């Protein structure tokens, strides 16, 4: 019945699967230590676990973790320790012992166990998908047997007992018990934990006076159950006083007896000491006795058996001897050595050492001791400090003595300076250990912080600190200690303000110094910042610290990376809640001064503003800080000292904050308050207001800005419109914004509705003046007349209807509203609509060609009069200027009308009575006209003519000119302005600068603008090119005054020095300088000025390397150019000469200049006159005694390389050698210079790379020098010495020394040796094979090849190589020896020889094929003769081969000579 359901095979499969599951689930188990495992605190813990059954675990994942699987204490996977995934605090404290990992056993070791290491540890093994773990509980404990009972002095009530015990973990149980073991309640209990987390327990018990007690202090650790106890037996309190009185009486009697005896001994010893002193100081006593006396004193001082009293008397004797003037310096030195050895001795006790040091100190402080003795004393101190044998306790005593000496007011400043030099050398010394240095630095710290030490001493101490920080020899640990001293001194309230100021000056100079490493600078800044954040530091000190930070930010010498790090730290301080508000206020003042400073670059300013923005946007920053930040923003926007570029950055930041969704509504409200106050403030510039209003417009129209922000923005618009203090121009801009928002299709209906409500409330309000209402209604009319119809316009119609029916609106407003809505209203009464109509008529009249010139003139006079009246409101002025702009831009208006109109504009700008704001508005319109590409060129030309006449006029105010120049600058910087317009504008600038009648102040202003423009990296290359072209024309013009040219050159120099100027702009500027120097029409005076400027650039170390490289590239071009006048070249070479002679100029610059000289002399394109002049300069430099030896050495190296060069023309070399001859002939030249020169001549003659012709020329010159009678005898002797050494030298070729030898004689010996070698090698091989009864094989033939190659190598004067080859291969080279030989020849010979050799080998192969016997071939005299003839041909045609090579390749020629040599 059971068999029906499932077949047998199915049963088998199921059973098999179940077995597999059972096997896979029981691969291994993990066993380990039993819990709990106890470990002592600060000890090492070892936890082990084992796989069961034992198996290999190297391939498994082994993970030790505590609470979380993802936070391993140790991780091992696939045979690797994964330190990157271990929890940070266990990385350096754990290790896994894997000695028995093959058996599946591992041990985790944890070092320096802390309290947090308690808990459950999981030992987790994972193999593939299978895993198992074992859990071990660990408990950290610490017990102590150190337990004490302290009994306080008894009183009438009783006695207090105090039980102490330390070094327990975890917190133990502590109690008092009586003699029966019963619990006694404690009076009080307390505990504390030290830095190692050990518990220190204290327990009090008060016992009354009328009882006899036995008390036990009992303490127990609950984890280990270890118990410790201590007992005390107490008699009655009053009974204990009787023996005390007896003891006191006995002590008094004993002391009295002792002091009487001591007094008697004292008198005797004093007499004895005086006797010793007189003996040692007496001149009658011989030296041997004195020495014996001093040695005995030293041995007694160092002896432990001599009592302290005797030692004290001896030390008094030493002190009096040192201070005595009658004792000679040698004896004093000996005494001090004995003191030093006693101090450094380990057997001398502490008391003796203290007395010795006191005697040294008193001698140093004493005014009667001479300076020589004091120097000896100080040297003794120094050697003791720096001694490694001296124990730390003695060093402490010694340093205390030094400290008291420094802080003493009676010590003179000279001695203090010597003492401080000792301290400095000890700090900077690498032999002095860190502990000693720490003690020394503590002395410095206490002296700085002490109020008793005078300011001069403190200044000396601070100089030590400064030199140690800046020194590269001082180790990092010492510098860290120094920085801690600085920080503690700054934060200390005991240190006076003058000392702190000195300290901060040191910090500042160290930060700005290039010699101080980056780590030390960061440490100094960190100490300043931590002091600022500290609540202990007073406000005056913080002010000093912040000034130091300010100078670091504004300094150009401070590295950019340090500045950015500093600014980041400032940001964290601002955002910190722990820092006080007054500190933050001071920090913001620094930021503000940095923003207003011209020395701080725009990049750092942007970074500062971003810091403030992030602080405003941060939710962690408190409201008080945010208010300070907002005030800062407001003051910077409203400040006149802040440059426009910075203000634009501020405005951009505000805009991004308003449009950001991450900024909370409260912060936005604070920012909007800034905008509102700035708009309504009359002191804020109109341009800044315009930027702020653009922010409002873009934010309202932006879809990313939330509705709450938009409502707040619109409320600002409403309050500004309704505010009577806001000027009409601002209101007009606000109304334009309203108009554009209503007409915009991107703005949602809700925003438009809100805007219309603003208009309605403003029209209905009685507080709003009639002028504002008129403007509002006018804008309403413009919206209604617009062809753009959208829901906003419909809403406006509804608004008009509601205003008409409103009872709160007065009749006049309603009347104006009705006039606007009617398109054909004609009214004679004065109202805004009439004004608009008059303006329209005025525009039509001016545009009409039928109107006569007289009528136009009347109209223009009227315009001028309206703009000049200060009572006319700004809104009307704006409208009028709009019309003027339109007239000038329209091409249909005739030029005469435009000219008249521009004449009137000029008169307005020249009139000092016209308001500056009106002029600014007018100039804004002029800028817009010039930027417009649709405006005719003729109109622009007329306009620029007027600008020129304004700038040239002396009656125009400086402010007006400044405004005008600002507009010109922005025009040139704008990329949308046409090139043609810029060219016209620059032409006018040129004419102004060339005009001698123009005031110098105007020219200065203009040139300042040019400088700012060129330094701006955003300006395009084309505009820079145009401007530099004009500068060139100004400098070349003879009509321009010298003062103007000098100012232009000053600007050029400052641009070139500036690191903010783009490299391409500098390159363009150099092009222009080069063109000026090349021009013959330019005056020589101007060229001299330019060249002086170049000299200054070269000599300055602050000038960038790239800058100098650009200048270096130009010098060869100027000198090579034939168009440049010789006079200019002379001046340039004079400058090069003076630079080379200067010691202050950098070596790198000089090296570069010498490279240029060398390249000029090596070029064939350079004119002969230029070379001659250049060589004159070289001669002058070498003849001058004031020029440094190193400089001359440099120059002579260059001369040598020129003479050795193949590319230098022979004529140039001839000229150079003429100069060398004239130097050697000159009697004024220093003998050392001549010696250097002759050394170079020797090296040239000895060199194989120098051409034969050059050597010949040089030898001719030497010959003429020796013949000359004008040459000094010393020079000739030096020259003959050099010739003698050259002739002796084996490296010199025969060609150089003996030119007349026939060519074949040189190789006669080589040829003989070659033939002899061939014969010898052949005979040896023949005899060798005969003895062995062997037949000749092919290898025998290659032995002949070996002899051939020997012949070739010897032929090339290379016997050594031949011998090496002979030794390497022996008599029988390998079977394919010809391959090695051919390769060798290819490397060291010419291809012609290879062809000859290959032909020979081929011929030999052909002969082999035709002969039966190799032996007969070997004996064939024909082959031998042919080979000899071929090699003789090669030998006697070396000259011809050399000639061929000369035409083929100069490099191969050099190689040929090298092999030959």
UniProtKB/Swiss-Prot annotation:
Annotated gene: Skint5
Gene3D superfamilies: Immunoglobulins (2.60.40.10)
Signal sequence interval, chain numbering: 1-24
Disulphide bond pairs: 49-123, 163-217
Note: Encoded by one of the 11 copies of Skint genes clustered in the D1 region of the chromosome 4.
Tissue-wise expression: Expressed in skin and, to a lower extent, testis.
Transmembrane segments: 1307-1327, 1346-1366, 1388-1408, 1428-1448
Protein name from the UniProt record: Selection and upkeep of intraepithelial T-cells protein 5
GO cellular component: membrane
């Amino acid at each position: 019945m059971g068999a029906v359901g499932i077949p047998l095979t199915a049963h088998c499969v199921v059973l098999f699967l179940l077995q597999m599951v059972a096997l896979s689930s029981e691969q291994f188990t993990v066993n380990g230590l039993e819990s709990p495992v106890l470990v002592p605190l600060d000890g090492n813990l070892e936890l082990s676990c084992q796989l069961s059954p034992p198996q290999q675990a190297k391939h498994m994942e082994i993970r030790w973790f505590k609470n979380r699987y993802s936070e391993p204490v140790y991780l091992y996977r696939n045979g690797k320790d994964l330190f990157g995934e271990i929890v940070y605090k266990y990385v350096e404290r754990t290790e896994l012992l894997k000695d028995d990992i093959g058996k599946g056993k591992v041990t985790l070791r944890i070092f320096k166990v802390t309290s947090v290491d308690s808990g459950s540890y999981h030992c987790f093994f994972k193999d593939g998908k299978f895993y198992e773990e074992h859990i071990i509980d660990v408990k950290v404990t610490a017990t102590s047997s150190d337990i004490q009972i302290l009994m306080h002095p008894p009183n009438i009530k009783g006695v207090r007992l105090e039980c102490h015990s330390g070094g327990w973990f975890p917190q133990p149980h502590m109690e008092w018990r009586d003699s029966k073991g019963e619990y006694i309640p404690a009076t009080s209990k307390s505990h504390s934990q030290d830095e190692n987390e050990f518990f220190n327990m204290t327990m009090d018990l008060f016992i009354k006076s009328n009882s006899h007690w036995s008390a036990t202090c009992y303490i127990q650790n609950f984890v280990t159950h270890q118990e410790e106890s201590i007992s005390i037996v107490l008699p009655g309190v009053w009974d204990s006083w009787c023996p005390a009185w007896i003891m006191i009486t006995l002590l008094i009697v004993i002391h009295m007896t002792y002091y009487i005896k001591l007094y008697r001994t004292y008198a005797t010893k004093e007499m004895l000491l005086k006797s010793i002193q007189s003996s040692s100081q007496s001149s009658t006593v011989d030296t041997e006795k004195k020495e014996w006396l001093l040695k005995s004193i030293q041995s007694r001082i160092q002896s432990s058996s001599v009592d302290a009293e005797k030692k004290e008397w001896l030390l008094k004797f030493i002190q009096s001897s040192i201070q005595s003037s009658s004792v000679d310096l040698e004896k004093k030195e000996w005494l001090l050595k004995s003191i030093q050895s006693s101090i450094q001795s380990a057997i001398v006790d502490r008391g003796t050492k203290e007395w010795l040091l006191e005697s040294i100190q008193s001698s140093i402080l004493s005014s009667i001791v001479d300076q020589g003795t004091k120097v000896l004393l100080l040297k003794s101190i120094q050697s003791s400090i720096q001694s490694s044998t001296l124990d730390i306790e003695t060093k402490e005593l010694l340093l205390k003595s030094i400290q008291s000496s420094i802080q003493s007011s009676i010590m003179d400043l000279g001695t203090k300076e010597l003492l401080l030099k000792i301290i400095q050398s000890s700090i900077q010394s690498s032999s002095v250990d860190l502990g000693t240095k720490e003690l020394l630095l503590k002395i410095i710290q206490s002296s700085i912080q002490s109020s008793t030490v005078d300011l001069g001493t403190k200044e000396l101490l601070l100089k030590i600190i400064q030199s140690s920080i800046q020194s590269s020899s001082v180790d990092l640990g010492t510098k860290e200690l120094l920085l801690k001293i600085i920080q503690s001194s700054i934060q200390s309230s005991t240190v006076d303000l003058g000392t702190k100021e000195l300290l901060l000056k040191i910090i500042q100079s160290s930060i700005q110094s290039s010699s101080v490493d980056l780590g030390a600078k960061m440490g100094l800044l960190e100490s300043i910042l931590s002091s600022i954040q500290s609540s202990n530091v007073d406000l005056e000190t913080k002010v000093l610290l912040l000034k130091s930070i300010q100078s670091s930010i504004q300094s150009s010498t401070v590295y950019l990376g340090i500045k950015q790090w500093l600014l980041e730290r400032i940001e964290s301080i601002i955002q910190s809640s722990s820092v006080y508000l007054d500190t933050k206020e001071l920090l913001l003042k620094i930021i503000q001064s940095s923003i207003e400073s011209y020395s701080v670059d725009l990049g750092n300013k942007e970074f500062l503003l971003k810091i403030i923005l992030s602080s405003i946007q941060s939710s962690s920053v408190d409201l008080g800080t945010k208010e300070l930040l907002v005030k800062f923003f407001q003051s910077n926007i409203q400040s006149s000292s802040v440059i426009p570029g910075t203000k634009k950055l501020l405005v951009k930041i505000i805009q991004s904050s308003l449009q950001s969704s991450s900024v909370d509504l409260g912060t936005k409200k604070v920012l909007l308050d800034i905008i509102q106050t700035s708009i309504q403030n009359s002191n804020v510039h109109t341009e800044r207001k315009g930027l702020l209003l653009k922010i409002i417009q873009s934010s309202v129209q932006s879809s990313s800005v939330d509705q709450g922000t938009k409502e707040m923005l619109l409320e600002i618009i409403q309050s500004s419109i309704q505010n009577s203090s806001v000027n009409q121009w601002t209101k007009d801009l606000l109304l334009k914004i309203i108009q554009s928002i209503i007409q915009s299709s991107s703005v949602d209906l809700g925003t438009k509705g809100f805007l219309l409500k603003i208009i309605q409330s403003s029209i209905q309000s009685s507080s709003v003046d009639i002028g504002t209402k008129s403007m509002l209604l006018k804008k309403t009319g413009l919206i209604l007349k617009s062809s753009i119809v959208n829901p906003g316009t419909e809403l406006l119609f509804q608004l008009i209807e509601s205003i008409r029916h409103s009872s709160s609106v007065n009749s006049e407003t309603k009347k104006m509203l009705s006039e606007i809505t009617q398109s054909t209203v004609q009214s004679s009464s004065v109202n805004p609509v009439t004004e608009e109509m008059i303006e329209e008529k005025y525009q039509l009249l001016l545009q009409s060609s039928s109107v006569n010139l007289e009528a136009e003139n009347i109209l223009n006079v009227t315009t001028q009069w309206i703009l000049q009246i200060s009572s006319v409101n700004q809104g009307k002025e704006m409208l009028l200027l709009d019309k003027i702009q339109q007239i000038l831009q329209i091409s249909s208006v005739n030029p005469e009308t435009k000219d008249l109109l521009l004449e009137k504009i000029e008169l307005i700008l020249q009139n000092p009575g016209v308001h500056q704001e009106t002029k600014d508005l007018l100039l804004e319109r002029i800028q817009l006209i010039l930027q417009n590409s649709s405006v005719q060129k003729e109109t622009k030309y007329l306009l620029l003519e007027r600008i020129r006449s304004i700038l040239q006029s002396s009656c125009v105010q400086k402010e007006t000119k400044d405004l005008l120049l600002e507009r010109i600058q922005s025009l040139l910087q704008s990329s949308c302005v046409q090139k043609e317009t810029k060219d016209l504008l620059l032409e006018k600038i040129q004419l102004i600068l060339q005009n001698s009648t123009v005031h110098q102040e105007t020219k200065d202003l203009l040139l300042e603008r040019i400088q700012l423009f060129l330094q701006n990296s955003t300006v395009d290359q084309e505009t820079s090119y145009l401007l530099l072209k004009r500068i060139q024309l100004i400098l070349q013009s003879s009509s321009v005054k010298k003062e103007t040219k000098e100012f232009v050159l000053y600007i050029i120099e400052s641009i070139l020095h500036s690191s903010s100027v783009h490299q391409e702009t500098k390159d363009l500027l150099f092009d222009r300088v080069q063109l000026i120097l090349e021009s013959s029409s330019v005056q020589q005076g101007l060229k001299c000025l330019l060249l002086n400027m170049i000299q200054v650039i070269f000599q300055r170390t602050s000038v960038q390397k790239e800058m100098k490289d650009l200048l270096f590239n130009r010098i060869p071009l100027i000198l090579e150019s034939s168009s440049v006048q010789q006079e200019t070249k002379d001046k340039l070479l004079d400058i090069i000469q003076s630079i080379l002679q200067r010691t202050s100029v950098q070596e790198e610059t000089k090296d570069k200049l010498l490279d240029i000289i060398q390249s000029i002399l090596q070029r064939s394109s350079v004119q002969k006159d230029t070379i001659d002049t250049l060589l004159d300069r070289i001669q002058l430099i070498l003849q001058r005694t004031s020029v440094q030896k190193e400089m001359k050495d440099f120059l002579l190296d260059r001369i040598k390389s020129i003479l050795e060069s193949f590319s230098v023309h022979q004529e140039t070399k001839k000229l150079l050698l003429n100069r060398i001859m004239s130097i050697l002939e000159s009697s004024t030249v220093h003998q050392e210079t001549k010696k250097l020169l002759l050394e170079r001549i020797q090296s040239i003659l000895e060199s194989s790379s120098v051409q034969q012709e050059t050597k010949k020329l040089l030898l001719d010159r030497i010959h003429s020098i020796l013949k000359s009678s004008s040459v000094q005898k010393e020079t000739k002797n030096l020259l003959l010495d050099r010739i003698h050494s050259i002739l002796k030298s084996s490296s010199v070729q025969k060609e150089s020394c003996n030119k007349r030898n026939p060519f074949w004689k040189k190789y006669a010996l080589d040829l003989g040796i070659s033939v002899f070698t061939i014969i010898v090698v052949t005979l040896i091989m023949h005899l060798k094979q005969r003895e062995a009864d062997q037949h000749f094989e092919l290898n025998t033939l290659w032995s002949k090849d070996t002899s051939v190659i020997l012949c070739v190598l010897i032929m090339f004067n290379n016997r050594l190589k031949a011998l090496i080859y002979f030794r390497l291969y022996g008599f029988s080279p390998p079977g394919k020896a010809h391959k090695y030989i051919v390769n060798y020849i290819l490397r060291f010979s010419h291809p012609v020889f290879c062809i000859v050799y290959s032909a020979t080998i081929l011929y030999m192969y052909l002969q082999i094929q035709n002969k039966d016997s190799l032996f007969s071939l070997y004996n064939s005299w024909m082959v031998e003769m042919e080979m000899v003839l071929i090699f003789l041909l090669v030998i006697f045609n070396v000259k011809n081969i050399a000639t061929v090579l000369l035409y083929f390749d100069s490099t191969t020629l050099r190689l040929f000579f090298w092999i030959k040599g």
